[in-house]
């Protein structure tokens, strides 16, 4: 999920990590085992004078499967379920409105959760910008998981940003 946001003007930083669980400073091994209550997530720092939260939400929706309650693509389990973690009432409102708009557009129930942000724990360094550090491996993973094919099936010709 870092790549689509990294390239956007106004995005200051994108950090892979874990949100929503009860274990302090969890490791990838703990989170991927599914017992911490965390979800794999990205933290996006942005300049609101250069990019809107609504634009970030649009990019988010076009890069996930909002219909899959079991995870994302070939990553299954509650730790891979999609969510938007909000930090204030305005962002909650915008996230819920965007979710409703996506549901209307797709004519389906959207299973992505909109949740209050809890402490964000950065993932280990080898996870940061994995797609840049390991481009061949990332491309292989993305292709074999059917990510691009599934996004095209959901969104049609709309760009995945």
Task: Provide a role label for each language-model segment.
Residues 1-161:
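Flexible coil/turn and secondary-structure edge motifs
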């Amino acid at each position: 999920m870092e790549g689509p946001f990294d390239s956007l003007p106004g995005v200051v930083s994108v950090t892979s990590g874990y949100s929503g669980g009860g274990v302090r400073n969890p490791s990838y091994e703990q989170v991927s085992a599914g017992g911490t209550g965390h979800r794999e997530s990205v933290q996006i720092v942005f300049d609101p004078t250069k990019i809107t939260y609504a634009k970030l939400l649009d990019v988010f929706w076009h890069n996930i499967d909002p219909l899959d309650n079991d995870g994302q693509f070939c990553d299954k389990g509650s730790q891979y379920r999609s969510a938007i973690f909000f930090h204030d009432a305005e962002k909650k409102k915008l996230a819920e409105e965007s979710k409703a708009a996506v549901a209307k557009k797709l004519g389906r129930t959207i299973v992505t959760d909109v949740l209050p942000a809890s402490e964000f724990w950065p993932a280990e360094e080898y996870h940061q910008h994995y797609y840049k550090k390991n481009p061949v491996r990332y491309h292989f993973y993305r292709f074999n998981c059917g990510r691009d094919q599934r996004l095209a099936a959901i969104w049609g010709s709309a760009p995945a940003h």
